[in-house]
Amino acid sequence: MEQKRCISSLTLEQLSAELKALGQPGFRAKQIFHWVHQKLVSVFSAMTDQPKTLRARLEEQFYIAAPQIERRQEAKDGTVKYLLRMADGNCIETVVMRYHYGNTVCVSTQVGCRMGCRFCASTQAGRVRNLEAGEICSEIYTAQKDIGERISHIVLMGIGEPLDNFDEVMRFLENITSPEGVNIGMRNISLSTCGLVPKIDLLAEKKLQLTLSVSLHAPNNEIRSGMMPVNDAYPVEQLMQAVRRYQNTTGRRVSFEYSMVRGVNDSDACAKQLADLIRGMGAHVNLIPINPVDGSPYSATDAANVRRFQQKLESLGVNATVRRRLGSEISAACGQLRRDEMNGKA
């Protein structure tokens, strides 16, 4: 028996081709796309304006991505963290963060991660598989239905390296920004990368109006390679050249993520090196007090030291902010909920 495919992963153009092959009129594609990506149904039987025969055929060949909420944690500030179980039984994490300008969802792009960053819980068991475009969409739809409020912003900063799943992430972006779907503005989307240089160049060619957020975390190769194995393949100099090419091609400002680790990357010397590295780029730096991760040798810099580091950067002409810590009383470290579930603790 042929394995069912995820209809949520098809772009409108791809869906049109599939329906044409089934002998359906052209207008059916938009109708079905609306049901999946705008009305957010999870079963074909809910598509009441479609012929029963077509619904039956779709049921035979496709499924709609609709993960189950395995675990839900809500913090006092309204942050909600989900452990979602996908159709194949694998689990991922999704987080809703509430801000004055709207609701932001942090989505995962892979089941696990193979980048090996030593301060991150989501990479400790490696990568199991890539998520399909429709599965990434379903994280947003599940969260939106659960909280009963519109999602206005997306950050691709959950489990996985988005550019290591390039094609599916591009299809996800096409579907999630489609006027025929939930129509989230591309400028309201941030994509994070640990620094896959060839994929940054590939992304630049797309000239998308999203915000690229580079997980830098260190101002030199010695420290960065100790924290992030990807730096051995794409050292700081190559990464920064790619980021500058990206800026020149897209005209978009880039932000840098910098996780503050006690005694590793939080010195005044590091602040000066960081300022020298990004000077003239008009870039923004997000300073992140790391969350404790079981099995990691790293610990967070104290708040006073984070503030001092920020002030040092600003005195050197760098725009830097300290990331607001949302949901601090829930399992906040990225990948921690999934790892607990894998270890039988959830």
Where are the model-predicted features located?
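Short linear Ser/Thr-Pro motifs
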Residues: 75, 108-109, 122, 192, ...
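Conserved AdoMet/S-adenosylmethionine-binding subsite of the radical SAM
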Residues: 144-320
